[in-house]
C-alpha cells in the first residue's frame, strides 16, 4: 500500500463515521502548491461553501500559496463565508492528512474566525 492509498483509506473511514453522525463537514484537501476547503452538507450531496488558494482574491494577498500563511488565509475565508450562510458548527474532515502544519493552520484560523468544531 502506497502513501496515497493509505491516506484515502484513513479518509474513507473517518468520513463514514462523520456520515453516521449526520454532521456538516469542513473538508480539507492539500497539494504541494495549493490548499482547498469546503463545507459540505450532512447528506454529502451539496457543497455549501468553498475557499482555496486558487481563487484570485485570496492568492493576490499572499506571497506564496503552498505555506501556512496561505492555509490560515483560506481558513479565515471559509469561516467568514460559512458564518454568512448561518453555519456555525462543523465537523473537521482532514481527509486522512496529518493534523500538522498547513492543515492545523487552516483549522486554527477557522476557529479564530468563529467556526466551531
Swiss-Prot record:
List the Pfam families: Ribosomal_L18p (PF00861)
Family classification: Belongs to the universal ribosomal protein uL18 family.
Q: How does it assemble?
A: Part of the 50S ribosomal subunit; part of the 5S rRNA/L5/L18/L25 subcomplex. Contacts the 5S and 23S rRNAs.
- Entry's CDD domains? Ribosomal_L18_L5e (cd00432)
Q: Which GO terms describe its molecular function?
A: 5S rRNA binding; structural constituent of ribosome
Q: What does this protein do?
A: This is one of the proteins that bind and probably mediate the attachment of the 5S RNA into the large ribosomal subunit, where it forms part of the central protuberance.
HAMAP family reported in the protein's UniProt record: Ribosomal_uL18_B (MF_01337_B)
For the keyword Disulfide bond, the answer is no
Species the sequence originates in = Sodalis glossinidius (strain morsitans)
Q: Which UniProt keywords apply?
A: Ribonucleoprotein, Ribosomal protein, RNA-binding, rRNA-binding
GO CC aspect terms: cytosolic large ribosomal subunit
Q: What sections of the protein cross the membrane?
A: none
- Tell me which SUPFAM superfamilies the record gives: Translational machinery components
Q: Could you tell me the superkingdom of the organism this chain comes from?
A: Bacteria
Any GO BP annotation:
translation
Q: Does the keyword RNA-binding apply?
A: yes
Q: What is this protein called?
A: Large ribosomal subunit protein uL18
Amino acid at each position: 500500500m502506497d502513501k496515497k492509498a493509505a491516506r484515502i483509506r484513513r479518509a474513507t473511514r473517518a468520513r463514514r463515521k462523520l456520515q453516521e453522525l449526520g454532521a456538516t463537514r469542513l473538508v480539507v484537501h492539500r497539494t504541494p502548491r495549493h490548499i482547498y476547503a469546503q463545507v459540505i452538507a450532512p447528506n454529502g450531496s451539496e457543497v455549501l461553501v468553498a475557499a482555496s488558494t486558487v481563487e484570485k482574491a485570496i492568492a493576490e494577498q499572499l506571497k506564496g500559496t503552498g505555506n501556512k500563511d496561505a492555509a490560515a488565509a483560506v481558513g479565515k475565508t471559509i469561516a467568514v463565508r460559512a458564518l454568512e450562510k448561518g453555519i456555525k458548527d462543523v465537523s473537521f474532515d482532514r481527509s486522512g492528512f496529518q493534523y500538522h502544519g498547513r492543515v492545523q493552520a487552516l483549522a486554527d484560523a477557522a476557529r479564530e474566525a468563529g467556526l466551531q468544531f
